Amino acid sequence: MIRIKKISAPETYAIRKTVLRKNIPLPFQFLGDLDEDTFHLGAFKNNELIAVSSFMKMHNANFSGEQYQLRGMATLNQYQGCGAGKLMIEKAFTLLNELKINYLWCNARIAAVNFYAKVGLNTFGDKFEIEFVGEHYLMFKKIVNQ
């Protein structure tokens, strides 16, 4: 059974570093990690942290109203496909709804676009490149009507 709970920013770093920043010269600590409005979720299986995600209050000019950005979603390789990511996103939707947030958005790696689409996010605009990481799409979900 997988449990989702809030965790601290430093608890996300090992998995971010292993999954998202392996052989990439970019920081695994994000601007905004420690902001008061930011929250981080962890997925635990048998009390082991197997996946992480971070949600930061961040404005994107393509959307209006209150917004959060999803960053640093990562699942340890041996646990990918077990449902941890979906459970974290569903928990985030609940929390963001309680906060009356209008939009959740993210810069999704090409490899993750299908996953995000399955959990209810839509692509917006053309694909774009992030140096050292690769091609991405802006994706979003409307959480609460304005």
Can you annotate each of these PLM segments?
Residues 107, 122-138:
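Conserved catalytic-core motifs of GNAT/GCN5-like acyltransferases
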Residues 16-46, 50:
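Active-site rim helix/loop that mediates acceptor-substrate recognition in acyltransferases
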Residues 16, 116, 121:
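Conserved active-site tyrosine of GNAT-family acetyltransferases
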Residues 89, 96-109:
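Conserved GNAT acetyl-CoA-binding A-motif
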Residues 58-70, 80, 132-135:
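A conserved beta-turn-beta hairpin within the catalytic core of GNAT-like acetyltransferases
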Residues 79, 83-91:
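Conserved acetyl-CoA pyrophosphate-binding loop and the N-cap/start of the following alpha-helix
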Residues 42, 48-58, 69-74:
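Conserved beta-strand in the GNAT
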Residues 1-12:
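A short beta-loop-alpha structural element at the N-terminal edge
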